[in-house]
Curated annotation (Swiss-Prot):
Subcellular localization(s) per the UniProt record: Endoplasmic reticulum membrane
Protein name, entry field: DDRGK domain-containing protein 1
Gene Ontology MF term list: ubiquitin-like protein ligase binding
Entry's transmembrane regions: 6-26
């Protein structure tokens, strides 16, 4: 019986060894994974070949194994919960960092957009200022050109008027009583004065009579009147009947004042009331002076 009991104990021990060994291996792997210190082996004496425990000892041995398994499961659960919390915290940290990074990027994009808008406005203002500067320069250059052209035109007109005046002085002639060409040129200024004064005194003079008075052709007389008007020596109008009506500067001013006061005035109304502003009565001073000059000339001849 003792030999049979020993064999039975040995078989039971082997079974326990084979049953406990996987548990021990699993616990070591779990502890290694969670960095936990290894648990002491409670049944070390069984592995060392000690006496076989009895049924009560085996029951007591099973209870710690179950308790140890429960504790290991609880620890694993706690470790898993801790890992889960750690992962959530790790996930929360990047999420907050991403929000901050996104806000920073948004602020940077807004700053760049504002800077680009300012640059665009500055560029437009510079372009507008440059365009205005060029336009001002072009306008000033055009004004200078117009002034130069006006001065050149005025100088040309004055030169032409002076040349025409010199020609006109030589065109006057006197009756052939021994007067030479040099005498005519010397008396040109006096003849010009007489021509102008004759028209002013006659007020309304037929062009043919004027030409006959100064021994000129009618067309030459018309040209001379136009020249004198350009020189501001005479002012007036030529009608379609071949008459020149002299109108002084004061009379023209009176007509302009009348038109300004009346507003719109028809030509017929102005013509009917022209005698209020323009004196058309001839003045005899020139005739008397002419007679005196003729008498003096006749006395000289005698």
């Amino acid at each position: 019986m003792d030999g049979g009991g020993g064999m039975l104990g040995a078989v039971v021990c082997l079974l326990l060894v084979f049953a406990i060994f996987p548990l021990l291996l699993w616990r070591r792997r779990s502890d290694a994974a969670h960095r936990l210190p290894p648990q002491p082996l409670q049944d070390e004496r069984v592995l060392r070949g000690g006496p076989a425990p009895g049924p009560a000892a085996r029951r007591m041995r099973r209870r710690p194994l179950s308790t140890s398994a429960d504790a290991s499961t609880s620890r694993d659960r706690d470790v898993d919960d801790a890992d889960s919390d750690l992962e959530e915290e790790i996930q929360d940290v990047p999420r907050g960092s991403k929000k901050k990074e996104k806000k920073r990027q948004d602020r940077e994009a807004q700053r760049q957009a504002e800077e680009a808008a300012r640059d665009s406005r500055r560029t437009k203002q510079d372009r507008y200022a440059e365009m205005r500067r060029k336009k001002d320069e072009e306008r000033e250059a055009q004004e200078r050109l117009m002034e130069e052209e006006a001065r050149a035109r005025k100088a040309k007109e004055e030169e032409a008027a002076a040349l025409e005046f010199e020609k006109w002085k030589g065109a006057f002639s006197v009756d052939a009583e021994g007067t030479t060409e040099s005498d005519t040129q010397d008396d040109g200024q006096g003849l010009l004065h007489n021509f102008v004064e004759y028209i002013k005194n006659q007020k309304c003079v037929p062009l043919e009579d004027l030409a006959a008075e100064f021994r000129m052709r009618t067309q030459d007389c018309i040209n001379r009147i136009i020249t004198l008007e350009g020189m501001d020596r005479l002012s007036g109008v030529m009608d379609d009947r071949g008459k020149f009506i002299y109108i002084s500067t004061e009379e023209m001013k009176a007509v302009a004042d009348y038109i300004r006061k009346q507003g719109r005035v028809s030509i017929s109304h102005l013509a009917s009331n022209s005698n209020q502003f323009i004196d058309l009565e001839p003045k005899p001073q020139y005739n008397e002076e002419s007679n005196l000059d003729e008498n003096a000339a006749a006395g000289t001849e005698l």
